[in-house]
């Protein structure tokens, strides 16, 4: 007789599958129609593989194949894998913006975990919002969970030069406007940008969030950088499947891994890799689900003295494929540890500390992962700006900015929203030059709605034709992690709720002082108060559907832009019987 699987405790899936009651036979019997033999319901852990595959999410188009490797690992370790499709918010498809649906996806994931017979979860993610949304949902349930990402695309090349996902889209688009590239050449370049399955091959938001998951300890060491089509990505998926079974046995939960120390490690990692500004709102939101007190002040404090040592676009010149060959994120974590910038005893999903995982790794290419003395910037952390224009903060990515613009005073050229910007920006009669500061309103969490990636406003053609490639830009929007420029983002409070950004007028003088973390509208306190008292909202107001729910309940960018009723951990208690 085959020995029954033994586990140190009764698992929650046995509330559905264990015993001989009518309801158990109902749950168990119907699942058997998929050909599962009776002994699979003997108490072994049921592992939910939460898969964000979708034909509409091309970055995640290969996740079905990876899910099979995860299943193989779960079977090998004595678990029972069941794949569950979950909400997949594609960054390049969803309108008005995938960010508006991050919280909806997190809610759907949370309920999918809590409401079904899972003992542990594998979070199979890739595209930008899929990683934070699944981490948020899993954190709110606090079942053993582990991340495996789909990995980046292979390098792109156009006429012998590297082409970075997104980064060169913005660059080539500006070249067309400046008359330096023909439309035909732009179309030719399109074929070089996405030449394999996977996420953006730059250090955009997808690769940043894969790195954040690894730095938080929520993915196996080395996961972040393996290319999507590399055979080692499949191996990583299979090893992840094996590991989650042991995590269930050990009852190793997200709340034990995603501690304040882990978040500080992730913030410093983001600085070292030149990561996306989007990591700010995502980590704030994830921390809010775990119950960790994380703020913009933590971002500024932890990232201020961390050099950017990863030489990847958009900050540097290489791509994720080279980063993987150089040793990937473990090398970066080791460098942080050697510099005293890592909480070495932070726990990871492996059951080992982060330092035990990375202390012996080797940097195979010091032009890709740079020595500190050759860093792209000596202070690479996301800058948190404050002042009368951003009382609750705004952010800027120094590694992607122009050094000569980090201290700048200029005349405001104001766009009331994205439509106003699009209507005016190509007009040669627009009163603007390279010394001006472009200001866009009503693009925040409530205003857009959803906080779209429109903050990196394209420059006016008449400025581009002068060879000018950057100007100071300020908004309450986000920007793509693949983008670059001296761009002030996430200005809080946003314009749509009557923040000071809402009352900036054409011709106002604005001062940006990055070294002193200052963003100042050069008008008197009395004039600012008068304008704010007279302000009236002029953004769209949805009256029904999810857009209405989102706009009513979304919080500000300074706290992570989560829905107010979703913050915190609600646990994984089994609900009442369904029949």
Curated annotation (Swiss-Prot):
Optimum pH is 8.0. It is an enzyme of class 4 (lyase). Its cofactor is [2Fe-2S] cluster; Mg(2+). InterPro entries: Dihydro-acid_dehy_C (IPR042096), ILV_EDD_C (IPR056740), ILV_EDD_N (IPR000581), IlvD/EDD_N (IPR037237), Sugar_Degrad_Dehydratases (IPR052352). Pathway: Carbohydrate metabolism. Its EC number is 4.2.1.25, 4.2.1.67, 4.2.1.6. GO terms for molecular function: 2 iron, 2 sulfur cluster binding; D-fuconate dehydratase activity; galactonate dehydratase activity; L-arabinonate dehydratase activity; metal ion binding. The lineage of its organism: Bacteria, Pseudomonadati, Pseudomonadota, Alphaproteobacteria, Hyphomicrobiales. Changing residue 200 to S: Almost loss of activity. Does not bind iron-sulfur cluster. This is L-arabinonate dehydratase. It comes from Rhizobium leguminosarum bv. trifolii (strain WSM2304). Catalyzes the dehydration of L-arabinonate to 2-dehydro-3-deoxy-L-arabinonate during L-arabinose degradation. Can also dehydrate D-galactonate and D-fuconate with good catalytic efficiency. Has weak activity with D-xylonate and D-gluconate. GO terms for biological process: arabinose catabolic process. The keyword Iron applies. Changing residue 127 to S: Loss of activity. Does not bind iron-sulfur cluster. Pfam families: ILV_EDD_C, ILVD_EDD_N. Changing residue 480 to A: Loss of activity. It catalyses: L-arabinonate = 2-dehydro-3-deoxy-L-arabinonate + H2O; D-galactonate = 2-dehydro-3-deoxy-D-galactonate + H2O; D-fuconate = 2-dehydro-3-deoxy-D-fuconate + H2O. [2Fe-2S] cluster binds at residues 59, 127, 200. Homotetramer. Belongs to the IlvD/Edd family.
């Amino acid at each position: 007789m085959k020995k029954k699987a033994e586990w140190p405790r009764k698992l929650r899936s046995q509330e559905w599958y264990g015993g001989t009651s009518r309801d158990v036979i109902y749950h168990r019997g119907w699942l058997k129609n998929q050909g599962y033999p009776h002994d699979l319901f003997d108490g072994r852990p049921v592992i939910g593989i939460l898969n964000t595959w979708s034909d509409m999410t091309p970055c995640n188009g290969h996740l079905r194949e990876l899910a099979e490797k995860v299943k193989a690992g779960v079977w090998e370790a004595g678990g029972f894998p069941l794949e569950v499709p979950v909400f997949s918010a594609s960054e390049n498809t969803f309108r008005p913006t995938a960010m508006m649906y991050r919280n909806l996806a997190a809610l759907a994931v949370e309920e999918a975990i809590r409401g079904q017979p899972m003992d542990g979860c594998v979070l199979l993610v890739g595209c930008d919002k899929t990683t934070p949304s699944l981490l948020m949902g899993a954190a709110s349930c606090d079942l053993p969970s582990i991340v495996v990402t789909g990995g980046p695309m292979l390098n792109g090349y156009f006429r012998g030069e590297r082409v970075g996902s997104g980064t060169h889209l913005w660059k080539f688009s500006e070249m067309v406007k400046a008359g330096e590239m023909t439309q035909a050449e732009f179309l030719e370049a399109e074929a070089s940008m996405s030449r394999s399955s996977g996420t953006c091959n730059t250090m955009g938001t997808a690769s940043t969030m894969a790195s954040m998951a690894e730095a938080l300890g929520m993915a196996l060491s080395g996961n972040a950088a393996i290319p999507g089509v590399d055979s080692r990505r499949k191996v990583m998926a299979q090893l992840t499947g094996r590991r989650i079974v042991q995590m269930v046995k050990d009852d190793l939960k997200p709340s034990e891994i995603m501690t304040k120390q882990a978040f500080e490690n992730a913030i410093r990692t983001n600085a070292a890799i030149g990561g996306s500004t989007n990591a700010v709102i995502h980590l704030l939101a994830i921390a809010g689900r775990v119950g960790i007190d994380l703020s913009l002040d933590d971002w500024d404090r932890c990232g201020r003295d961390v050099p950017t040592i990863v030489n990847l676009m958009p900050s540097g010149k290489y791509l994720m494929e080279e980063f993987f060959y150089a040793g990937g994120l473990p090398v970066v974590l080791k460098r942080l540890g050697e510099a005293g910038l890592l909480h070495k005893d932070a726990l990871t999903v492996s059951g080992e500390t982060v330092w035990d995982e990375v202390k012996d790794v080797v940097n195979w290419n010091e032009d890709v992962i740079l020595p500190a003395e050759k860093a792209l910037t000596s202070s690479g952390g996301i800058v948190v700006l404050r002042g009368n224009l951003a009382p609750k903060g705004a952010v800027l990515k120094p590694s992607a900015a122009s050094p000569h613009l980090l201290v700048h005073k200029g005349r405001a050229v104001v766009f009331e929203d994205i439509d106003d910007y699009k209507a005016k920006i190509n007009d040669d009669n627009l009163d603007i030059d390279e010394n001006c500061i472009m200001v866009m309103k009503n693009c925040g969490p409530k205003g857009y709605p959803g906080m779209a990636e429109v903050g990196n406003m394209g420059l006016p053609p008449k400025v581009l034709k002068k060879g000018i490639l950057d100007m100071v830009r300020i908004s309450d929007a986000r920007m793509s992690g693949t983008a670059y420029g001296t761009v002030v983002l996430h200005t809080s409070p946003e314009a749509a709720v009557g923040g000071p950004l809402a009352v900036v007028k054409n011709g106002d003088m604005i001062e940006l002082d990055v070294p002193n973390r200052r963003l100042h509208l050069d008008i008197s306190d009395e004039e600012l108060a008068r304008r704010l008292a007279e302000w009236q909202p002029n953004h769209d107001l949805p009256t029904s559907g999810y857009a209405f729910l989102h706009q009513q309940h979304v919080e500000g960018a300074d706290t992570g832009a989560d829905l107010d009723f979703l913050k915190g951990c609600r646990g994984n208690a089994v609900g009442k019987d369904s029949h």
